[in-house]
């Protein structure tokens, strides 16, 4: 039997969902222009690196912390990790991109659901206290829908895999079938990545591969581009 609450959260994983994810490569375009990423095999290597070395130690750990803070009604903890998500994201384009995507996701979530937590989160932004982040909003929405933290993280990882693969299909380019083969291969690694996220300590938050950040920074100087970041 289909769990409709899970489906409601999965709706936000659609690569065509209007959060602006289609406009961001998070440094992938720099690798493509250097021809470091140029086919399915090299894209999969980059995607593994991005998911395991950057997303895991930023969004992933933050989602776990936010979920437990929601259970404990710990607003200060949510504000703290939200601020850290913003300031530890050193590349300007990815930092601004996350803020824009977070703002769009929050507004869409409020248009669809009456969540007190998401409304509170939005109000913090309106009062100039924080910048909004998609990982925090996605966690709040999953919590509101009664979805367990393991599934929330799984769906968020899938969302990133799906949107980045669609962007790679356009930019490298790859065929649509090749893109679906990438997603199929990456799905097999989602559970392992999620379990790793759940095992990490909070002190691990913010660790990332310098090469990813450097290429995200260098994207600012790419003259011919199809992505904002």
From Swiss-Prot:
Q: InterPro entries, per this entry?
A: UreF (IPR002639), UreF_sf (IPR038277)
Question: Recorded GO terms, molecular function?
Answer: nickel cation binding
- Respond yes or no to whether keyword Cytoplasm is given for this record: yes
Q: Which domain of life does this protein belong to? A: Bacteria
Write down the species.
Staphylococcus epidermidis (strain ATCC 12228 / FDA PCI 1200)
Q: What is this protein called?
A: Urease accessory protein UreF
The gene name on file is: ureF
Query: Where is this chain primarily localised?
Result: cytoplasm
Residue ranges annotated as transmembrane are none
Q: Pfam families in the record, alphabetically?
A: UreF
């Amino acid at each position: 039997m289909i769990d409709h609450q899970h489906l409601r959260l999965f709706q936000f994983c659609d690569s065509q969902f209007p959060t602006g994810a289609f406009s961001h490569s998070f440094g992938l375009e720099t690798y493509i222009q250097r021809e470091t990423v140029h086919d399915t095999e090299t894209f999969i290597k980059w995607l593994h690196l991005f998911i395991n070395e950057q997303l895991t130690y930023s969004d992933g750990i933050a989602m776990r912390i936010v979920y437990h803070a929601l259970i404990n009604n710990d607003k200060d903890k949510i504000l703290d990790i939200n601020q850290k998500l913003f300031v530890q994201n050193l590349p300007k384009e990815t930092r601004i991109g996350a803020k824009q995507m977070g703002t769009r996701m929050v507004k869409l979530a409020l248009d669809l659901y009456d969540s007190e937590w998401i409304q509170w989160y939005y109000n913090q932004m309106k009062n100039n206290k924080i910048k909004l982040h998609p990982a925090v909003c996605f966690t709040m929405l999953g919590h509101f829908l009664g979805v367990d933290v393991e599934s929330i993280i799984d769906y968020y990882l899938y969302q990133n895999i799906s949107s980045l693969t669609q962007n790679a299909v356009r930019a490298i380019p790859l065929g649509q079938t090749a893109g679906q083969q990438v997603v199929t291969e990456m799905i097999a690694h989602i559970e392992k990545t999620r379990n790793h996220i759940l095992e990490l300590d909070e002190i691990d938050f913010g660790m990332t591969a310098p090469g990813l950040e450097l290429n995200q920074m260098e994207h600012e100087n790419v003259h011919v581009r199809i992505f904002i970041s």
